[in-house]
């Protein structure tokens, strides 16, 4: 087993691989490394808001980093809806609080993985962008002293907003790719747009700490712009989502100047076809019409380096396109092929032990994205190949029937099932690393009257301590309370505990966190009155059936449950005292919202635009909800002075946020007493000012 001291060596090696040394830009320099031995994980699936919380990924960083060199996560910027998977982005620089966690949690997660030698790939969505409160009012943001203030000139002139009577008309060039009708298509021919995207990618890598990009919907704009962006960002890892066949994908790679890899959709489609028909000859294509090779981009040695293979992803995992065969066998095939394999999160969670073993085999043999393959047998019943890595070779058989490779015995079998077998003479190494961990004696939950939680460190270096916080901040050697292993912490009110193991000045474990409640805290839900003539609330929870809360579908008509707050009409409902977590749907008997899950405390919502028969909601609790320690209006004054909103306060201002009356954030600044409002229309806005001591003031201001 690897020992803890190996971490520093691993991290150093990976850092050198990622950063390299200064040199001329060779072919593929900013694309994907040659002979790359790494394995990637897609760290999310559709609507996987729980599994992909930044805090959850950070807690699992030790285990995940043992097996994966790269993890692809959703776009982390704040989007136009909540919840959102990240594909309707609004903010690039100033707001990375998303459906997956806060910006602080994001930075903690990236830093934790980087310390274990695993890089995080950002889902970069720059084909399109949404406005803050309208279709076209992009936020004004500042990065490295440059202010980016975009208008209709940044939008392709043939975007659908051109046909909207109440919206500004786009004046950019015609789109250089396919249209996306969910947001505004950006004009990539415009150098100001290009400069904004270059700055955004610089922020992702040099500020947040991402190591590369997964470009969403690259069919939406010309491939030549990927070259511009990657050469500016000096991206060592770039992969594009070009959903198409072999010829068009390879054409796209060439048009980027080979500055990006691409997902191997042909690999996925051939895998689907082979397993659905139980015809394993479909796993083979002929290179140059003569040499049998694994099907997909990877069948050509020219493109193996630029191929990221996958079995399913968040988009394909649906009835019409998802892989329906044996997942373990498909992963055995993928992990014994060239290209960089990308394991799907759902497959990982459901087949973890098997996939761990298969990754260990790949890494022990030294298979890379450019390893050579000799197909030994290809029939309807089976696929057999010899794969040569940097440390030796293996034989893999996929399918039915027996096969006895020459020179191998049963003792050389390192993995097998009824539908696959792998032989190798290379010793298979253990990838599990023994790392320090911190455990909490009680799981998150409700403990009426209070609870004692024991903090314990295991596998810790001599003299190590535990650092913990209860104020939501990140524990470290310099932040938090330092205690010895075995310390008992008494909790007598709702508290989130975060803890790490500290050795000297270094954090040497992942963060362990838990939230404890000591009394019943019923949920109160406010919905801003929508245009619907009927509004129903339908709710359920783990402990309550829908019939016990608001009745069976469509729930309770809330016409008699309205309140006026801050000049706004709200529908309001409070759960029974013992129900402190609830799921809810707003509907009018015909149209409805998406499921809003795990609602706690007091929450305020507004409806977004209806799409089909469902719509999303935006959580506006930060704007309208009650805030503890609100300052008197006499202590904090806010006024608009022309194009600037000015705050007068008795101490340093930590942050300023400005919102439209619909709840959309339109401007933000940190550690400043003023904020630019030059790009905002005249009208009433809501402000939220946080002072250095945590005091919060909120109210209305006129622009």
Describe each region flagged by the PLM.
Residues 626-703:
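C-terminal outer-membrane/trafficking sorting elements
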Residues 474-484, 529-577, 590-597:
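Aromatic-rich carbohydrate-binding modules that target alpha-glucans
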Residues 431-521:
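Short, compositionally stereotyped local motifs that mark structural "simplifiers"
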Residues 501, 588, 689-691:
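Conserved structural position at the C-terminal beta-strand
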Residues 507-516, 592-603, 619, 696-703:
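Edge beta-strands of extracellular beta-sandwich domains
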Residues 27-180, 186, 219-240:
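Acidic/aromatic-lined carbohydrate-recognition and catalytic surfaces
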């Amino acid at each position: 087993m690897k020992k803890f001291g190996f971490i520093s060596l691993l991290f150093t090696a990976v850092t050198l691989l990622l950063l390299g040394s200064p040199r001329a830009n060779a072919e593929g320099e900013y694309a994907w490394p040659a002979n790359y031995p790494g394995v990637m994980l897609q760290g999310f699936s559709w609507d996987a808001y729980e599994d992909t919380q930044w805090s959850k990924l950070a807690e699992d960083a030790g285990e995940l980093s043992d097996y994966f060199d790269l993890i692809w996560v959703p776009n982390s910027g704040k989007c136009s809806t909540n919840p959102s998977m990240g594909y309707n982005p609004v903010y690039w620089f100033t707001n990375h609080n998303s459906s997956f966690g806060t910006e602080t949690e994001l930075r903690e997660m990236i830093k934790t993985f980087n310390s274990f030698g695993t890089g995080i790939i950002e889902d970069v969505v720059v084909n399109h962008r949404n406005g803050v409160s309208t279709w076209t009012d992009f936020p004004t943001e500042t990065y490295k002293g440059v202010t980016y203030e975009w208008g209709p000139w940044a939008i392709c002139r043939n975007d659908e907003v051109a046909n909207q009577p109440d919206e500004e008309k786009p004046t950019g060039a015609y789109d250089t790719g396919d249209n996306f009708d969910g947001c505004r298509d950006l004009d990539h021919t415009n150098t100001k747009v290009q400069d904004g995207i270059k700055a955004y990618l610089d922020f992702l890598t040099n500020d947040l700490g991402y190591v590369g990009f997964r470009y969403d919907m690259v069919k939406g704009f010309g491939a030549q712009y990927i070259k511009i962006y990657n050469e500016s960002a000096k991206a060592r890892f770039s992969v594009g989502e070009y959903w198409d066949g072999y010829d068009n994908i390879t054409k796209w790679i060439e048009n980027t100047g080979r500055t990006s890899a691409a997902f191997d959709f042909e690999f996925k489609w051939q895998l689907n076809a082979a397993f659905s028909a139980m015809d394993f000859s479909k796993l083979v294509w002929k290179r140059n019409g003569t040499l049998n090779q694994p099907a997909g981009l990877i069948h050509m040695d020219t493109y193996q380096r630029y191929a990221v293979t996958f079995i399913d992803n968040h988009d394909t995992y649906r009835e019409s396109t998802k892989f329906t065969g044996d997942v373990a066998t498909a992963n055995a095939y993928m992990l014994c092929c060239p290209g960089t394999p990308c394991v799907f999160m759902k497959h990982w969670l459901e087949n973890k032990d098997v996939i761990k073993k298969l990754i260990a085999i790949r890494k022990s043999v030294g298979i890379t994205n450019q390893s050579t393959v000799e197909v030994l047998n290809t029939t309807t019943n089976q696929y057999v190949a010899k794969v040569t890595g940097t440390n030796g070779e293996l034989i893999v058989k996929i399918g039915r029937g027996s096969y006895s490779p020459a020179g191998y015995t049963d003792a050389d079998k390192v993995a097998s099932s009824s539908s696959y077998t792998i032989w190798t003479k290379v010793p298979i190494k253990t990838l599990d690393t023994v790392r320090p961990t911190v455990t909490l004696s009680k799981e998150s939950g409700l403990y009426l009257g209070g609870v004692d939680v024991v903090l314990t460190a295991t596998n810790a270096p001599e003299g190590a301590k535990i650092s913990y916080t209860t104020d939501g901040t990140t524990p470290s050697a310099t932040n938090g309370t330092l205690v010895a292993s075995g310390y008992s912490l008494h909790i007598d009110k709702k508290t989130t505990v975060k803890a790490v193991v500290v050795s000297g000045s270094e954090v040497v474990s992942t963060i362990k966190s838990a939230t404890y409640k000591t009394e019943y805290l019923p949920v109160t839900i406010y919905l801003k009155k929508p245009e619907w003539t009927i509004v129903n609330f339908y709710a359920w929870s783990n402990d309550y059936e829908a019939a016990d809360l608001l009745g069976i579908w469509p729930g309770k008509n809330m016409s008699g449950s309205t309140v006026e707050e801050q000049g706004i009409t709200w529908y309001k409902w409070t759960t029974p005292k013992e129900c402190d977590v609830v799921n809810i749907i707003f509907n009018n008997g015909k149209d409805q919202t998406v499921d809003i899950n795990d609602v706690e405390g007091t929450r305020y919502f507004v409806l977004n635009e209806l799409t089909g028969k469902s719509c999303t909601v935006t959580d506006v609790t930060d704007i309208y909800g009650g805030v503890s320690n609100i300052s008197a209006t006499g202590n904090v004054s806010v006024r608009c002075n022309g194009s600037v909103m000015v705050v007068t306060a008795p101490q340093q201002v930590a942050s300023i946020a400005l919102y439209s009356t619909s709840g959309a954030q339109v401007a933000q600044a940190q550690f400043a007493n003023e904020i630019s409002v030059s790009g905002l229309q005249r009208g009433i806005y809501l402000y939220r000012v946080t002072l250095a001591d945590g005091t919060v003031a909120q109210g209305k201001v006129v622009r």
